[in-house]
Amino acid sequence: MLEYDTRNDDENIISGNSATHVMTSPVQLDLNPDTSYDVLNDVFNLTATDIAVVAPTDEIMAQFGLDDPFAEVDFDIVGGNFKLLIGNEYVDSDGKVLGRYCYADGINMIYMFNTDTIPWATVMPLDISMTMITSTYIYSISSIDVATADSSTHFELNGDSSDFQVKCSDGDVTADNFKSFYQFILRAPAEELYLEETDAPADITITITHQSGTDKIEFIKSDDRKTIIRLNGRTSFKCRTAYTSRLIENLGHLLNGENMVDTW
């Protein structure tokens, strides 16, 4: 599910993303404004290549795969609701798939649409989303807590680009080095979806308190050289464990006044 990003309406909230909408299901994730454009906007230029059937019966709807559709597209737009059922594929004389049969709710016809005009039939969540789990602007953050099995570190953030300051519970850190550390947090990669719930304790927990609330990112080591990522209580992604290993190392670099390592 994609929903309008209400952060756009709050002048006090600065987001690190320019997309107008966010993904709320199956996971919470910012959209990539470029790759999500067609999914959000093609409904306004939807043009069929042909009409297959006028006034189809229930039996005909079933024949075209529209009684149990391959996909359903539901848009809440200005002026009302638009619903499109996407059914079976149709092919040319050589068996090449050209598109799918579709039915627009309220218009009693079965249409034929080329595949490239109905992106909703093929899109996957990570195709249109940002790979970053969070894009919270650093100057809108009041605190960040990083907890591991061995330690807990609290950072207080104040100021904007002209007077940014950081206070750390474990000693002095420079503003520039902390910015580099936060950039590494932002790069936490949503490399694959993982929706299976787990009650395993987190190996690393990052809590970000900002103008519009709190985000909690938990990293839970798996048994396949990957790490489960739980975002705000929802198991959502997996990433390579190499990232979390480097994250712990970079926390040490930050506290020791050393440069971050960007690769993993």
What are these regions (language model features)?
Residues 1-264:
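Secondary-structure "cap/kink" motif recognition
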